[in-house]
Amino acid sequence: MEKIIIDTEQFQRTISRISHQIIEKHAILDNIILVGIKRRGAEIAEMLQKRISELAQISLPLMALDITFYRDDLNLTSKDPVYTGVEHQLNIEGKTVILIDDVLFTGRTIRAALDALLDFGRAKRIELVILVDRGHRELPIRADYVGKNIPTALNEQVQVRTEHYDGVSQVALIHSTNG
């Protein structure tokens, strides 16, 4: 069973609200880098970059981060995984990095992303943007900017859909009858 919990219009309003919050929090945007966790976090980062550019007339640097090599909760098929890293590596030394992902659940994806970012240098500060926080944390991770808090049961799944990958921007709550 599926329920749309954020429709396309709400999705765009959420991107706009988070963009406004980032601008309001940072008087100067010059030292900010947006880092989106592949796949949907990177697309959300692109949406934020575009909206911030429209609002503040500044194009923030953007980096897409692949954290597969850093994860501790996936079974890898090879003992020597291929690390693809980032599409465009930026110098994060002394910068404020705004890390962006679609769903915050256990916190393990964010922990892996933090490990990956540390390999690029020492950021002055790292802030976290999450489109949907569904609870059930296993690690002490908290987002600085949250699109929507949606408490879920463990047998539910939050599915963020984006234009690039799914042809529509929305969030669905999927209830599994198996568990």
From Swiss-Prot:
Gene3D superfamilies: 3.40.50.2020
Top-rank EC class of the record's enzyme: transferase
Superkingdom: Bacteria
Chain span(s) of sequence motif PRPP-binding: 97-109
GO MF annotation: an example: uracil phosphoribosyltransferase activity
Catalytic activity as recorded in UniProt: UMP + diphosphate = 5-phospho-alpha-D-ribose 1-diphosphate + uracil
Assigned EC number: 2.4.2.9
Binding site for substrate: 39-40, 101-109, 134, 158
One Pfam family in the UniProt entry: Pribosyltran
InterPro entries: PRibTrfase_dom, PRTase-like, PyrR, PyrR_bifunctional
Biological process, per Gene Ontology: regulation of DNA-templated transcription
Keywords: Glycosyltransferase, Transcription, Transcription regulation, Transferase
Chain's role: Regulates the transcription of the pyrimidine nucleotide (pyr) operon in response to exogenous pyrimidines. Also displays a weak uracil phosphoribosyltransferase activity which is not physiologically significant.
Similarity comment: family membership: Belongs to the purine/pyrimidine phosphoribosyltransferase family. PyrR subfamily.
Xref: NCBIfam families: PRK05205.1-5
Protein's UniProt name: Bifunctional protein PyrR
Organism of derivation: Haemophilus ducreyi (strain 35000HP / ATCC 700724)
Gene: pyrR
